[in-house]
A protein has these predicted regions:
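N-terminal beta1-alpha1-beta2 module of alpha/beta enzyme domains
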Residues: 1-79, 181, 295-298
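Active-site mouth loops of central-metabolism enzymes
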Residues: 24-38, 89-97, 177-188, 260-273
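Conserved, mostly hydrophobic/aromatic
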Residues: 51, 75, 106, 149, ...
């Protein structure tokens, strides 16, 4: 990887208020995957040592990336400060009681460092088959499961008789340390944005443009208001993919298939300096929580994390 010239970036200015906290995390998955004890352990150690806010692990049942729940538990036991979340955890197909129990336990043993984030899952037949839910059924499953998980996190006895789940006197203990245990949602389709406004506490899209983030923040906020809710202005972020060299054609084609009218360069930053520029654009439209996400496998994970830290961590407020 080309050497990065060291410098101290100028502080970013928030679009509406200088009091909003900018935070930078680091994520991995797909083709970029430290997937053994040494590689993943050293990555976790670097993130903790350098002062990253959080670690994020993608969920792909059919890929070689680590299972996010296992990876987060490992990180919890290896660190004292670093937060961690799935980017994002597929909810349709999961037993909501077991999911609530696992995440509450993770938050408990980490002393309140878990960051629950859920989504419908990617539009991939093999992935959908792995979770056992038809694409047409995912939204209804999600809409019943998430409120049920929230009720279970209260520690109260829960009775529920729904279309997919029935519970008679189920109680989850221990409760999460965080109260409330806030949930971030992924996705960027209008239906997903409205769901975030109805059910979520924060929004974390990926592979998106600053303009789309600005539009999404408006729709999420408007939907929340229409349902008598509000989303904390600090709870809008983005997972920001980047590459060290040219974007591999296989990724470019996937992006073109997903959004034919979009230039892949608009959603994938080129180099660490390009990554910083993309964060500046996102901050200007109201986002403040970011996950730097390498799309290609770094030749040296340690050097990559060091370079991202040098370029981005001074921007945290």
């Amino acid at each position: 990887m080309p050497a990065i010239r060291r410098h101290t970036p100028e502080p970013l200015r928030w679009a509406d208020s200088s009091d909003v906290r900018i935070r930078v995390g680091f994520g991995f998955g797909g083709a970029a995957r430290p997937d053994d004890h040494d590689a993943f352990g050293h990555l976790v150690d670097d993130l903790e040592r350098l002062g990253f806010d959080s670690l994020w692990v993608s969920e792909r049942a059919g890929s070689a990336t680590l299972d996010p729940m296992v990876a987060m538990a490992y990180a919890a036991g290896r660190t004292e400060r670093l937060k961690f979340g799935p980017a994002v955890m597929v909810l349709p197909g999961r037993n909501p009681v077991l999911c609530a129990k696992a995440l509450a336990s993770l938050d408990r043993i980490s002393n309140g460092r878990a960051l629950p984030a859920f989504g419908l899952g990617i539009a991939d037949t093999a992935e959908q088959q792995a979770f056992g839910v038809q694409r047409s059924e995912r939204a209804a499953w999600f809409d019943e499961a998430l409120p049920l998980i929230r009720r279970l996190w209260t520690g109260d006895v829960v009775d529920h008789d729904g279309e997919r789940f029935r519970l008679d006197g189920v109680r989850i203990l221990p409760r999460p340390v965080q109260d409330p245990f806030e949930v971030w949602l992924g996705g960027q389709a209008p239906s997903e944005l409205r769901r975030c406004g109805r059910l979520g506490d924060g929004w974390l899209p990926s592979f998106t443009t600053p303009a789309a983030v600005a539009d999404g923040i408006r729709l999420v906020s408007e939907t929340a208001a229409a349902h008598g809710r509000s989303i904390d202005p600090e709870h809008f972020g983005a997972l920001v993919p980047f590459v060290h060299a040219a974007l591999p054609e296989r990724f470019a084609q996937r992006l073109r298939d997903r959004q034919p009218d979009l230039d892949p360069a608009e959603v994938v930053a080129h180099g660490i300096r390009g990554l910083r520029s993309r964060l500046e654009e996102l901050v200007s439209v109201g986002a403040s929580k970011f996950v730097a996400f390498p799309l290609d496998e770094p030749s040296d994970w340690h050097a990559t994390v060091e370079d991202v830290a040098t370029e981005l961590l001074p921007l945290q407020t």
